[in-house]
């Protein structure tokens, strides 16, 4: 064997001279680079790979046809390689390459042996096909084919011929092995896990680089609607829990136990993220490097083709070689681009998992006060999305610079010193852009802060939508939100202008660099090299231009990442209980025994507490002991700090002095029920069980003890009833009962109840206390009796407490001890006039109720038995001891996606844009695209003229016009960007937000039964963010790229009819591809947006109930749930990104075919000049880049338009459900009398389109017939869930009556309220809701009180003084302008704030009427007589005089003022309607009576309808005629009582009359309250 046929093979070459037509490499070059170096590299990489796989478990069955085939072929290939090695030793001495031949065969044989071993381990212990084998076999296969051709052409003997035949056989073996190795092993796994269920988790490099693994998903999306639950899982490497575990290791200074440690040990968040995802971050580097090389090869291809056409002798082999080179280059570009983006997108979604999990975990570590100010929902949504958008072109930073350096060197070899022109311009633009980028971060932070405020405001409003509508604040809140939106858009102006500047700077190098370079070198550069120079400049400027455009998003992303880091650096709550010994202070009290040490639940020693470090003390000098297994009650006046003390024991409030010692039993779970019940948006049963183990008997026990059985039997879906966002679909009492039941169901050894009885009716309160806290109650009967703490205003139960703690108004402990001691020491407790336990216990605690109560309520013993039987029948216990609820399942949101026409979405988005602006935008884009593409054709004309015998124009002419075209293109690009950002984006964004939020504020409450808070928040967070940020950028990019693409296609068609003949085929192929793509991608876009709503809802739930969850040790369960929701949201988003790059791969393949067609055309037909070939290939070089950019921008645009589609669908859905918006607007003075009439009205919470059955559970109100006279004060009573709040909602137009309801069935002052616009109705009727709403953190006291901003400071101060709130505000730095912190207010103070807000509304209304009317209307202050003030003072002094002298509670007598009695009959005094929905549920009796006086004086002539559970106003303050009896004041505040039960009026009359009726239901309620002579 000598292969000595050609003497040129002995040289390095690389091109052989004088042999094989000159179209081949030398044999020496091939032996070195084809047969030696690649196998040697494989040997180096294979050894550590085998070592890493050796210890891994076997996960794939090796007894299969695939494994056998690979091993057999591997051994056959090894035998062949050994044979070739032996034959190589037979070479002649004259053959100078025999040594190189031998070394090549030794290395190749060794690599073949090692490949068999690698194949074994890769097959059995790796989920994917072997990447190292895929790359090695694929690369060496192409090299071996080329080498095999050379060997065949170099055969010089029979031995050479035999050698070549064996070598050909090894090539065939390697080809089959490459195919077998690339096959998936999915069906051969020993154990199937999430990786085997993923689409790409078991695929190899070939499948990944061609995206063939998406074929099943694409076909499925094309043929059928996609469902979220049908999407495949992500592979193990992208599991959230796995990623977060690694992320936590690198964020020790931010999260976990070391949170809050020394900041010097912290890594910047960007570094921590890079360290966590180091391998995913590095994987895209190799394909990106390959892409750089292939991209630069395009310039050499253009040079080779133009050189071939310029040559006189054109060899056919060279033409075929150019065609082959074109195939290799463009196939390589397509594959490397796909692999690069695949790995980079995986990194981005891994980063999203880490950041989202980190933000959620940090949220669980923060205090309630910190969470209220942080508004972290924006971080999880908007900021993370901007971080990912900024990191999208992360690898372009280094890749573009490397490519720029290489291309600059190539330009230097051709242009010498002139290469500095394009490079200098590029550097100058880069410096300018860096300067711009320095300012983007600051502007971006400002914008994000305003976005955060707006989203937090909307989230707060949506969480309290019922209260907003009841309070008539919908229009006011709408104005506030729209004002915040305008502020946000103004804040975005700086970022938008800088983005325009950055994008304009990015266009400068690409458009101006060719002009100045050709102007300087046109006389010295050969015309045939012009296209090569232009191509090289394009390779220099195009990636840098893309990089420049990425600077603004990158800086914005880094600014958002900095905001996230700031959030992660917040000080965590310092929990003083837990399993961490360093955080736990156990009780050590002298030499006491361990049993005695742990007989305490809590002990506070000289404790002082404050909400935040810089805030004043809310509790001070606290010394108390809460014993284990004892019942401790905490009482005190409104604002004394009862709730604060509960939070202090939980560790939620900062301890500034003293110690809090925690007993052993309180280290674990603590069941905490706050004043505002925390409920997640799930079923009632799920809220009660709440991650505890299911126990049927315990479940039934707690719902009976809590009184929930009565309500469950009357709800349509029973246990399976959805509670809605924040319990929207339930009454306040029902929400509280569920929270109580949850605490009872838990296995906690310590239970803390914060004012849980205040929102319950008298009978329910009595039932709850007797069955839960009483001597025979549930908590005292349990064998492991827990420590129970109850904060309450219901002081009648104090005699039954084991220990009593009394707080003073100054925030310290006034007294504490047992009842017997405190009731006789002359202190605060004795002044309450509560009767002793011997008088209370027989009737309250032992279940001896009054006969009138037992006989006249629907829930008798037999009813309760039937309720219990119904309850037990509803529950079906499955074999795994989990309960399921029979009956209709709650219908959740549908995950089937349908997409309406895309054009409709564009019309909806652009409807607010003027026609002039839209036409100008399109015209400027067309100008940009045409003048971008046409100069390349202009170069073709220049070359033709330059190569002709008689030139028509000088070079200056051609360069001048060439420069003019580029200048016009730059101007068109700038105008396109400016118009899109200003005239389109700002106008459309403002219009979309305004119309949709206004529609939601007008929507009926039934809408929020089907759409939860998280979903709606997602619309105004993620979707609006896409509309504001991503949509204008992607719209600009796509329209410009589309204009360029069409212009290039037109220019190419004009230059060659042959190329135009390919267009129909290319268009048909692209149409089919895009149609297949859109069917799937549009569904995935909607799913990706919708899948985030549950994640955001879960996040909002945790933020709202953080104290409850932290106390119950449930954060781990919620973290796991967050991980599940995060993974679900990742699936459609990740698959969408992959589908987008599948489309890019197909477009690159189409470009490849066009390039092959052009090269084939010019090399084979040879009737096209150099100009056509050069211009065509330059355009194709740019065309591929433009298509890639167009694909990305189109994908982003479609994603953004998916958000527009969702917003459009939401608007249409809301508008279709909204009623009453076409009604009338009555005169400003309406209602002037307050005459209310209801005639046979029934109503349901189901929308009017839903089927409603006429059953107890289906109707909220049943056949209500009611007439309320002007000026009448009506109290609505009844147990929780009886329909009291529903009646208020009906009067406000928020609850829809049945369609069968007749005309004029609901009238106020003679007008049917259904004919009045609902927004107007809520504004005209003043209402005070049970729960107070506040603006987000940062809003001042005055802004929260005077939402309209129409009152003076003196008016606001006057009202606050009347409500005894001014002293609280006066203590704040800044007074009314200081930031309000609602979490520092007690529930009673919050309710007083609501009353103050209503008083201000009434005064503003009176002022507006006076200004609009010529009638002089006396003001409230004029109607308030001096005698009333004196009488009020007398009442209070009388009360103080008898304190401590009577065994009855001292009640100030309410005497109505003369104005109140006469105002309703005066024509010059306008009345109205005031609705009070349990506004006094958290007030003590003295505070309640004081504010009834204020309401009476502030609202003269008003018809007042009040829902109340507080019946103390009806109890006489003198000696009762018999024990347990109650009477009403003859001249009291209320002159009419209505009792509701099951949605029906069961009693109606004057309080005195009803109390004197022996079987009165109202009398039964009052007797329940009278047994303690105190409010219930």
UniProtKB/Swiss-Prot annotation:
Q: Indicate which residues the UniProt annotation says bind ATP.
A: 636-643, 1278-1285
Q: Which UniProt keywords apply?
A: ATP-binding, Cell membrane, Membrane, Nucleotide-binding, Transmembrane, Transmembrane helix, Transport
Which InterPro entries would you find in this protein's record? AAA+_ATPase (IPR003593), ABC1_TM_dom (IPR011527), ABC1_TM_sf (IPR036640), ABC_transporter-like_ATP-bd (IPR003439), ABC_transporter-like_CS (IPR017871), ABC_transporter_C-like (IPR050173), ABCC_6TM_D1 (IPR044746), ABCC_6TM_D2 (IPR044726)
Q: What GO molecular function terms would the record report?
A: ABC-type transporter activity; ATP binding; ATP hydrolysis activity
What is the membrane topology here?
Multi-pass membrane protein
Main location, first listed in the record: membrane
Q: Where in the cell is it found?
A: Cell membrane
Protein's UniProt keywords contain ATP-binding: yes
Which segments constitute the ABC transporter domain? 602-834, 1236-1567
Spans through the membrane: 27-47, 72-92, 99-119, 267-287, 289-309, 321-341, 387-407, 417-437, 500-520, 525-545, 915-935, 957-977, 981-1001, 1035-1054, 1060-1078, 1142-1162, 1171-1191
Q: List, alphabetically, the CDD domains matched.
A: ABC_6TM_ABCC_D1, ABC_6TM_ABCC_D2
Has UniProt tagged this entry with the keyword Chaperone?
no
The ABC transmembrane type-1 domain extends over 289-556, 919-1199
**UniProt-listed Pfam families:** ABC_membrane, ABC_tran, TMD0_ABC
An example Gene Ontology CC term for this record: plasma membrane
Further facts: Gene clusters encoding host-selective toxins (HSTs) are localized on conditionally dispensable chromosomes (CDCs), also called supernumerary chromosomes, where they are present in multiple copies. The CDCs are not essential for saprophytic growth but controls host-selective pathogenicity.
- To which protein family does this belong? Belongs to the ABC transporter superfamily. ABCC family. Conjugate transporter (TC 3.A.1.208) subfamily.
Q: What does this protein do?
A: ABC transporter that may provide the dual role AAL-toxin export and self-protection by allowing the fungus to evade the harmful effect of its own AAL-toxin production.
What is the recorded name of this protein?
ABC transporter ALT5
- The species is Alternaria alternata
| Gene for this chain | ALT5
């Amino acid at each position: 064997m000598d292969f000595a046929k050609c003497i040129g093979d002995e040289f390095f070459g690389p091109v052989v001279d004088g042999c094989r037509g000159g179209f081949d490499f030398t044999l020496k070059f091939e032996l070195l680079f084809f047969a030696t170096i690649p196998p040697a590299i494989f040997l180096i990489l294979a050894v550590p790979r085998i070592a890493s796989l050796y210890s891994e478990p076997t996960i794939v069955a090796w007894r299969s046809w695939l494994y056998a085939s690979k091993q057999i072929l591997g051994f056959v290939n090894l035998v062949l390689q050994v044979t070739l090695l032996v034959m190589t030793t037979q070479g002649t001495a004259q053959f100078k390459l025999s040594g190189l031949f031998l070394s090549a065969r030794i290395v190749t044989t060794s690599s073949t042996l090692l490949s068999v071993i690698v194949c074994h381990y890769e097959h059995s212990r790796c989920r994917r096909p072997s990447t190292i084998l895929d790359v090695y076999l694929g690369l060496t296969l192409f090299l071996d084919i080329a080498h095999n051709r050379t060997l065949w052409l170099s055969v010089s003997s029979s031995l050479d011929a035999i050698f070549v035949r064996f070598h050909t056989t090894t090539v065939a073996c390697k080809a089959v092995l490459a195919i077998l190795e690339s096959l998936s092993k999915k069906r051969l796994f020993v154990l199937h896990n999430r990786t085997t269920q993923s689409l790409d988790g078991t695929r190899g490099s070939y499948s990944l680089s061609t995206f063939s693994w998406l074929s099943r998903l694409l076909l499925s999306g094309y043929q059928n609607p996609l469902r979220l639950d049908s999407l495949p899982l992500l592979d193990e490497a992208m599991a959230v829990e796995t990623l977060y575990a690694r992320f936590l290791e690198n964020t020790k200074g931010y999260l976990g136990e070391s949170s809050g440690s020394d900041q010097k040990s912290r890594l910047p968040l960007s570094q921590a993220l890079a360290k966590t995802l180091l391998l995913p971050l590095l994987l895209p580097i190799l394909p990106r490097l390959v892409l750089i090389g292939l991209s630069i090869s395009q310039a050499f291809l253009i040079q080779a083709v133009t050189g071939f056409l310029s040559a006189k002798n054109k060899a056919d082999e060279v033409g075929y070689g150019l065609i082959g080179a074109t195939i290799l280059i463009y196939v390589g570009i397509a594959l490397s681009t796909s692999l690069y983006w695949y790995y980079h997108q995986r990194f981005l979604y891994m980063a999203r998992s880490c950041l989202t999990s980190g933000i959620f975990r940090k949220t669980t570590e923060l205090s309630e006060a910190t969470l209220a100010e942080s508004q972290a929902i924006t971080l999880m949504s908007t900021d993370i999305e901007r971080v990912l958008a900024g990191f999208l072109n992360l690898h372009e930073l280094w890749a573009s610079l490397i490519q720029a350096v290489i291309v600059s060197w190539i330009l230097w070899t051709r242009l010498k010193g002139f290469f500095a022109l394009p490079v200098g311009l590029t550097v100058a633009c880069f410096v300018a852009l860096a300067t711009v980028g320095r300012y983007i971060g600051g502007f971006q932070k400002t914008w994000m802060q305003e976005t955060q405020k707006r989203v937090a405001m909307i989230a707060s409003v949506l969480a309290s939508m019922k209260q907003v509508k009841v309070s008539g604040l919908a229009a006011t809140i709408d104005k506030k939100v729209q004002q915040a939106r305008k502020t946000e858009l103004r804040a975005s102006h700086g970022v938008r202008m800088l983005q325009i500047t950055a994008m304009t700077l990015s266009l400068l190098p690409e458009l101006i660099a060719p002009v100045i370079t050709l102007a300087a070198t046109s006389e010295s550069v050969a015309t045939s090299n012009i296209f090569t120079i232009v191509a090289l400049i394009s390779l220099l400027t195009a990636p840098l231009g893309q990089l420049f455009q990425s600077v603004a998003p990158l800086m914005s992303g880094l600014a958002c990442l900095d905001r996230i880091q700031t959030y992660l650096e917040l000080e965590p709550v310092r929990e003083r209980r837990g399993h961490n010994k360093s955080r736990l202070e156990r009780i050590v009290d002298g030499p006491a025994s361990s049993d005695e040490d742990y007989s305490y639940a809590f002990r506070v020693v000289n404790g002082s507490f404050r909400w935040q470090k810089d805030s004043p003390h809310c509790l001070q000098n606290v010394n108390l002991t809460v014993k284990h297994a004892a019942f401790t009650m905490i009482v005190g006046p409104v604002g004394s700090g009862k709730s604060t003390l509960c939070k202090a024991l939980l560790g939620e409030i900062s301890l500034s002095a003293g110690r809090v010692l925690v007993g052993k039993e309180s280290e674990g779970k603590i069941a905490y029920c706050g004043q505002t019940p925390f409920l997640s948006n799930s079923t009632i049963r799920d809220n009660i069980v709440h991650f505890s183990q299911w126990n049927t008997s315990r479940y039934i026990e707690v719902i009976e003890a809590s009184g929930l059985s009565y309500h469950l039997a009357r709800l349509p879906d029973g246990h399976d009833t959805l509670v809605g966002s924040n319990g929207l679909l339930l009454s306040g009492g029902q929400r509280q009962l569920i929270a109580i039941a949850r605490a009872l169901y838990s296995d906690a050894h310590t239970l803390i109840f914060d004012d849980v009885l205040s929102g319950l009716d008298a009978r329910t309160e009595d039932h709850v206390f007797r069955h839960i806290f009483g001597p025979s109650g549930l908590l005292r009967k349990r064998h492991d009796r827990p420590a129970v703490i109850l904060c309450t205003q219901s002081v009648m139960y104090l005699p039954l407490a084991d220990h009593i703690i009394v707080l003073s108004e100054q925030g310290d402990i006034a007294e504490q001890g047992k009842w017997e001691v405190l009731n006789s020491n002359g202190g605060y407790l004795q002044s309450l006039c509560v009767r002793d336990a011997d008088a209370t216990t027989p009737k309250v605690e032992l279940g001896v109720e009054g006969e009138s109560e037992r006989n006249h309520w629907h829930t008798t013993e037999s009813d309760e038995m039937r309720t219990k039987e119904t309850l037990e029948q509803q529950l079906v216990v499955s074999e795994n001891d989990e309960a399921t609820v029979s009956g209709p399942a709650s219908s959740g949101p549908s995950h089937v996606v349908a997409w309406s026409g895309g054009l409709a979405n564009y019309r909806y988005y652009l409807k607010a844009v003027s026609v002039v602006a839209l036409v100008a935008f399109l015209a400027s884009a067309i100008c940009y695209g045409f003048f971008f593409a046409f100069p390349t054709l202009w170069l073709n004309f220049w070359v033709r003229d330059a190569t002709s015998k008689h030139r028509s124009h000088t070079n200056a002419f051609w360069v001048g016009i060439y420069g003019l075209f580029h200048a016009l293109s730059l101007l068109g690009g700038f105008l396109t960007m400016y118009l899109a950002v200003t005239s389109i984006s700002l106008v459309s964004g403002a219009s979309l937000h305004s119309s949709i939020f206004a529609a939601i504020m007008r929507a009926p409450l039934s809408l929020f039964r089907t759409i939860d808070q998280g979903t709606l928040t997602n619309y105004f967070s993620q979707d609006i963010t896409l509309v504001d940020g991503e949509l204008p950028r992607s719209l600009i990019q796509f329209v410009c790229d589309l204009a360029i693409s069409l212009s290039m296609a037109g220019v190419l068609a004009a230059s060659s009819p042959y190329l135009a003949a390919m267009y129909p085929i290319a268009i048909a192929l692209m149409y089919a591809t895009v149609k297949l793509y859109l069917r799937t991608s549009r569904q995935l876009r909607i799913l990706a947006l919708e899948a985030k709503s549950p994640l955001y809802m879960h996040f909002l739930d945790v933020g709202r109930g953080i104290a409850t969850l932290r106390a119950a040790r449930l954060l781990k369960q919620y973290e796991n749930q967050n991980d599940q929701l995060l993974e679900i949201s990742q699936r459609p988003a990740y698959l969408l990104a992959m589908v987008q790059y599948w489309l890019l791969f197909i477009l690159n393949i189409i470009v490849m075919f066009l390039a092959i067609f052009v090269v084939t055309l010019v090399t084979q037909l040879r009737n096209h000049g150099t100009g056509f070939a050069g211009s065509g290939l330059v355009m194709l070089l740019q065309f591929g880049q433009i298509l890639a950019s167009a694909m990305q921008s189109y994908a982003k645009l479609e994603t953004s338009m998916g958000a527009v589609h969702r917003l459009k669908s939401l608007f249409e859905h809301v508008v279709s459900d909204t009623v009453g918006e076409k009604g009338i607007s009555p005169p400003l003075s309406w209602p002037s009398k307050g005459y209310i009439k209801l005639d046979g009205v029934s109503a349901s919470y189901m929308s009017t389109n839903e089927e409603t059955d006429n059953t107890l559970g289906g109707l909220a109100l049943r056949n209500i017939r009611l007439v309320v006279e002007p000026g009448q004060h009506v109290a609505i009573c009844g147990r929780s869930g009886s329909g009291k709040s529903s009646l208020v909602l009906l009067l406000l137009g928020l609850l829809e009556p049945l369609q069968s309801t007749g005309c004029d069935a609901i009238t106020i002052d003679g007008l049917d309220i259904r004919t009045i616009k609902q927004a107007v109705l809520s504004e005209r009727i003043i209402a005070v809701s049970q729960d107070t709403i506040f603006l987000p953190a940062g809003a001042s006291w005055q802004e929260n009180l005077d939402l309209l901003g129409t009152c003076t400071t003196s008016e606001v101060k006057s009202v606050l003084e009347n409500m005894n709130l001014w002293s609280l505000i006066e203590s704040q730095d800044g007074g009314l302008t200081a930031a309000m912190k609602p979490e520092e207010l007690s529930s009673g103070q919050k309710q007083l704030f609501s009353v103050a807000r209503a008083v201000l509304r009434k005064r503003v209304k009176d002022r507006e009427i006076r200004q609009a009317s010529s009638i002089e209307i006396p003001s409230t202050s004029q109607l308030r007589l001096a005698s009333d003030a004196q009488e009020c003072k007398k009442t209070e002094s009388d009360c103080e005089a008898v304190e401590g002298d009577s065994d009855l509670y001292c009640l100030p007598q309410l005497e109505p003022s003369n104005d109140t009695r006469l105002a309703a009959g005066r024509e010059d005094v306008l009345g109205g309607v005031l609705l009070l929905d349990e506004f006094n549920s958290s007030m003590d009796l003295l505070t309640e009576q004081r504010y009834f006086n204020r309401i009476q004086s502030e609202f003269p002539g008003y018809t007042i309808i009040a829902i109340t559970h507080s019946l103390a106003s009806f109890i006489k303050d003198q000696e009762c005629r018999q024990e347990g009896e109650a009477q009403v004041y003859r001249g009291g505040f209320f002159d009419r009582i209505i009792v509701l039960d099951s949605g029906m009026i069961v009693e109606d009359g004057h309080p005195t009359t009803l109390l004197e009726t022996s079987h009165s239901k109202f009398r039964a309620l009052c007797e329940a309250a009278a047994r303690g002579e105190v409010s219930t």
